[in-house]
Regions:
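Canonical Rossmann dinucleotide-binding motif of NAD(H)/NADP(H)-dependent dehydrogenases/reductases
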Residues: 8-42
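Short C-terminal tail/terminal secondary-structure segment
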Residues: 2-9, 153, 229, 240-257
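Active-site helix of classical SDR
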Residues: 129, 164, 172
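Substrate-binding pocket helix/loop in short-chain dehydrogenase/reductase
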Residues: 105-106, 110-118, 198, 209
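Active-site loop immediately N-terminal to the catalytic Tyr-X3-Lys motif
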Residues: 107, 153-159, 216, 234
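Alpha-helical segment proximal to the catalytic Tyr-Lys
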Residues: 134, 176-181, 237
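Residue(s) in the substrate-gating loop at a strand-loop-helix junction
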Residues: 148
């Protein structure tokens, strides 16, 4: 068993969680973490084979999980997600983690790409929250939105991605104010996390990113998942509208240069 799970115990026993973008990376690690802490987890993605593989791993370890193929930017698909979750029970936890990115400078980015990136990276969080809000209100649920350190610091070739991640922080605060005290809403801001997004990145570029952190290494999806689990657990009952940075000190190193 993961030592952090052993230390904190089963904080989500009897609860149902929905995790989007759950077929890989931070989403998969979060689904696995919540399942190890005894949540029943609905994994949402469009990468069916990978998503089902994560579910199979969870159930093999004795957890409860199922996979739903859905476009999180389509409101009708959220009705199916909620129906699937209700096979376990009302939704207590929503992790809005799905993302997409097209790398191009603003002057080369098509309006269609801009709209799709905002739809998945921003609008999907609104649609998901709206869909599960009745459950969250009734059961004093928790929401975690996956933003990014690039909500605050620009990154070449990512205008729509950065814009959406910045807007997520405003959405986080707005939802926390509007729906407290029944619902808590927080955001995590990962920095350089070693996921499939780094596939194809040159060793030199990787080393440059590592050098920009205070801990001189990449973070892992499991470390972000631990932060998300904390924000959604009862220990964080007095935390809402917050922005938890998980970046190995990347932000402070960048600010000191």
């Amino acid at each position: 068993m993961d030592q952090s799970v052993r230390r904190y115990g089963a904080r989500f026993t009897g609860r149902t969680a929905v995790v989007t973008g759950a077929a890989s990376g931070i989403g998969a690690a979060t689904a696995e973490r919540l399942a190890r802490e005894e949540a029943a987890v609905v994994l949402v993605d469009i990468a069916d084979e990978r998503g089902q593989a994560v579910v199979d791993g969870i159930t093999k370890d004795g957890g409860h999980a199922r996979y739903v193929h859905a476009d999180v930017a389509a409101e009708d698909d959220w009705a199916r997600i909620v129906t699937a979750a209700h096979d376990y029970g009302p939704v207590d936890v929503l992790i809005s983690n799905a993302y997409t990115v097209d790398v191009a400078p603003a002057h080369e980015l098509s309006p269609e790409s801009w709209q799709r990136q905002l739809a998945v990276n921003l609008t999907a969080s609104f649609l998901g929250f709206k869909a599960v809000l009745p459950d969250l209100r009734a059961h004093r649920g928790a929401v975690a939105l996956t933003s990014s350190v690039h909500a605050h610091a620009g990154i070449p070739g990512h205008p729509a991605y950065a814009a959406a991640k910045g807007a997520l922080l405003s959405l986080c605060g707005q939802l926390a104010v509007e729906y407290g005290p029944e619902v808590r809403v927080n955001a995590v801001l990962p920095g350089p996390i070693l996921t499939g997004a780094w596939d194809g990145v040159t060793p030199a570029e990787r080393e440059r990113s590592i050098a920009q952190t205070a801990v001189r290494r990449f973070g892992t999806p499991e470390e972000v998942a631990a932060a998300i689990a904390f924000l959604c657990a009862d220990e964080a009952s007095y935390i809402t509208g917050s922005r938890l940075v998980v970046d190995g000190g990347w932000s402070v190193v960048k600010d000191s240069v």
